[in-house]
Regions:
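The beta1-alpha1 cofactor-binding region of Rossmann-like NAD(H)/NADP(H)-dependent oxidoreductases
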Residues: 22-33, 65, 178-179
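Substrate-binding pocket helix/loop in short-chain dehydrogenase/reductase
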Residues: 59-60, 67-72, 154, 165
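Active-site loop immediately N-terminal to the catalytic Tyr-X3-Lys motif
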Residues: 61, 108-114, 136-137, 172, ...
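Active-site helix of classical SDR
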Residues: 83, 119, 127
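Alpha-helical segment proximal to the catalytic Tyr-Lys
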Residues: 88, 132-136
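Residue(s) in the substrate-gating loop at a strand-loop-helix junction
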Residues: 103
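C-terminal helical subdomain
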Residues: 143, 166-189
Length: 189
């Protein structure tokens, strides 16, 4: 896409290589193919950041099974798929860092977001188990559970919802994407 081409162009330099890949993280075969391509292009994978996510908010009474399943498939199953696809590389290297994006909604819940809350709390439980399973092999698994972060996804919210959320934040403003990016850098190092 144009957006990914622009990002690749901005990040590429004489000293660094940046490449964009298109895949569907909710499909295990595509995850395995993606990992193979990255290994071919870069030789190794040191860090995995699982950040695929969607919302399809609705009250339970109005939520369709299809909307529930698609949020679980994209938000939670993708974490399993990419982690499983990278596991062999991390085990071979006896090192690796897995960073999974959850949400404060996965900890606290939120009315009208039962599917999203289930997916994000599932990420927390999955990550705890993977940390215990792979930690002895020097493979770390951490979760970031941000509160309200200003993104394209939150830009769709009404002013009243944004104001209500901001009033419950000590800084009285949403977090920025660079706040989360800096935390990823710390956890990956």
């Amino acid at each position: 896409s144009e957006a990914s081409d622009l990002i690749v162009s901005e990040l590429s330099s004489d000293k660094s290589l940046c490449k964009a890949y298109k895949s569907d993280a909710s499909k295990i075969e595509e995850c395995e193919n993606l990992v193979e391509k990255v290994i071919t292009d870069f030789g190794n994978i040191d860090v995995l950041i699982n950040n695929a996510g969607i919302t399809k908010d609705n009250l339970l009474m109005r939520m369709t099974e299809e909307d529930f399943d698609s949020v679980i498939r994209i938000n939670l199953n993708s974490v399993f798929n990419m982690t499983k696809a990278c596991q062999r590389i991390f085990l071979k290297n006896r090192a690796g860092s897995i960073i999974n994006m959850s949400s404060v909604v996965g900890v606290k819940g939120n009315a009208g977001q039962s599917n999203y809350a289930a997916s994000k709390s599932g990420i927390i439980g999955f990550s705890k188990s993977i940390a215990l399973e792979l930690g002895s092999r020097n493979i770390r698994c951490n979760v970031i559970a941000p509160g309200f972060i200003k993104t394209e996804m939150t830009d769709k919210l009404s002013e009243s919802v944004i104001e209500s959320w901001n009033n419950n934040i000590p800084l009285k403003r949403p977090g920025e994407t660079y706040d989360v990016a800096n935390l990823c850098l710390f956890l990956a190092s």
